Amino acid sequence: MQHVHPDDKTRSFYTGIGITLAIALVAGVLCKIPYLDIMGQLVLAIMIGMIWGHTIGLKNSHRSGVQFSSKKLLRAGIILLGLRLNLSAMYDAGLHAFLYAGLLLTVALVTVYSLARLFRVNKTLSILTACGTAICGAAAIVAIAPLVKAKESTTAVSVAVIAVLGTMFTLIYTMMYPFLPFTDYQYGIFAGGTLHEIAHAVAASTAGGEEAENIAIVVKLTRVALLVPVAILIGIYMKKREPQNNKQRFSLKTLPIPWFIFGFLAMSAVNTIGFLPESVVNLLISLAYLLLSMAMAGLGLNVEFQAFKKFGFHVFFAGLLGTLILIGCGFGLIYVMGLG
């Protein structure tokens, strides 16, 4: 077996990050071109990443750096983006955001799981795909996977399904935005309540401007926060299904807690107090968008269509139909709840 020198691994790691940075910068230039500007830098970064991944390709040695961008830099960007928000505005949206997000999360969990089982998808893959659709995409899938004892291959398929669906609907939302009967605020609620990943919600909501983006993040982070109670319920359910002689005590310490939400709230508090000069805040927000664009590039590079060939399209169609039902419910609830 060939020995890999630590310096080579480090170089490959930073090369992977460098690829996402290059894509983010190119997307930043392209988004200033007429007709492409409606997509925005974040959506363009996803598209370029997908094109790069399926033409030039991505070396396995570079994947660790790309994963770092798509996960760690995403969270760093979200935290810094908290500087855009005022806590009083979040408080005003709080109850409505919670109810809207909670209702749609329940719809998505029940619908996607039921459809997947109807299409004869195994229980583990059905649970993971339902959680990915309902809560926060790949992050929810990876968090729930140990609770349901999912194999790596099963987790990978679920992540691939959500990545493809989320990216597809992000592009559709962006293209359809001018034709939707929503105010910018309503569009932000809709995007935050129905799209899969945090990255997808942020990318799609940029089409509606700052107001749409702000409320989209609030609604989406409300869904992310609900990962903890969902994980508790799934953990208890799985423990009850274990054979009596194999049962271990369920521990709250093993629960996946999205700590970055507290960083986001802390940055919002800093902005509310007015602790930082406006010039510094603007600089940090620009940095947030660069980090988010790099995360989008990583998301696009990680979309793997090959997984469907091995496991079939049943889970994809369950996710697709479930997402369409989620979108329909999200659309209707905007008016039923009188949001915006």
Curated annotation (Swiss-Prot):
It is found in: Cell membrane. It is a multi-pass membrane protein. PANTHER family: INNER MEMBRANE PROTEIN YEIH-RELATED, UPF0324 INNER MEMBRANE PROTEIN YEIH. Keywords: Cell membrane, Membrane, Transmembrane, Transmembrane helix. Coiled coil: none annotated. One of its GO terms (cellular component) is plasma membrane. The keyword Transmembrane applies. The chain crosses the membrane at residues 12-31, 36-58, 94-116, 126-148, 155-177, 215-237, 257-276, 281-303, 315-337. Belongs to the UPF0324 family. InterPro entries: UPF0324_pro (IPR018383). Its main location: membrane. Disulfide bonds: none annotated. This is UPF0324 membrane protein OB3406.
